[in-house]
């Protein structure tokens, strides 16, 4: 994608990125209870990621928001562990390396924050993302960690940073 940039989220991005996240969950049939689809914080990501040791990155192409991803210190995770959260890309932005680029930004930021491990929660419906996570070095866990409240996610993965 030409003229693509990754930048920190801004307050004015809230509505667009929330719409993208929900659109993608509908696209994959993953718009179910216990996911970010129904999580009220999805509408306020700028505010959510103003918390200490958290960051959210927006992917923009030709001046249009096409996705994003973040790092969050989810309560209840083991010491030194953060969560990779809300990695979503519009169909037009997939398959071009942008998802990996977003994750690499998150990895660097997590290391900068002092984290040594990164956890994520996902669903089988998001099969494209699962392949990306596997290629990035995430391995499967037998159960969930932390207290994200996303009981609709039934796949859990971890990566050493």
Which residues fall in each region the model found?
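A generic, residue-level signal for flexible/boundary positions that often mark functional hotspots
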Residues: 3, 83, 120, 138-139
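Acetyl-CoA-dependent GNAT
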Residues: 4, 8-92, 103-105, 109, ...
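Generic detector of contiguous secondary-structure segments
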Residues: 6-14, 115-124
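Glycine-centered loop/turn positions within well-structured domains
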Residues: 15, 96, 155
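C-terminal "cap" of GNAT-fold acetyltransferases
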Residues: 20-23, 116-119, 123-136, 142-161
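Conserved glycine-rich acetyl-CoA-binding loop
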Residues: 64, 77-78, 90-104, 111-113, ...
């Amino acid at each position: 994608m030409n003229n693509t940039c990754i930048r920190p989220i801004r307050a004015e991005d809230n509505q667009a990125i929330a719409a993208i996240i929900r659109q993608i969950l509908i696209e994959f049939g993953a718009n179910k209870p216990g996911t970010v689809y129904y999580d009220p914080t999805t509408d306020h990501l700028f505010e959510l990621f103003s918390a200490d040791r958290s960051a959210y990155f927006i992917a923009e192409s030709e001046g249009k928001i096409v996705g994003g991803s973040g790092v969050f210190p989810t309560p209840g995770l083991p010491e030194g562990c953060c969560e990779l959260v809300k990695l979503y890309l519009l169909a037009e932005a997939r398959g071009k390396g942008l998802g990996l680029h977003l994750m690499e930004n998150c990895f660097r930021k997590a290391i900068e924050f002092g984290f040594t491990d990164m956890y994520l929660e996902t669903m089988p419906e998001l099969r494209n993302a699962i392949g990306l996570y596997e290629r990035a070095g995430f391995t499967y866990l037998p159960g969930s960690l932390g207290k994200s409240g996303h009981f609709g996610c039934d796949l859990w993965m971890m990566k050493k940073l």
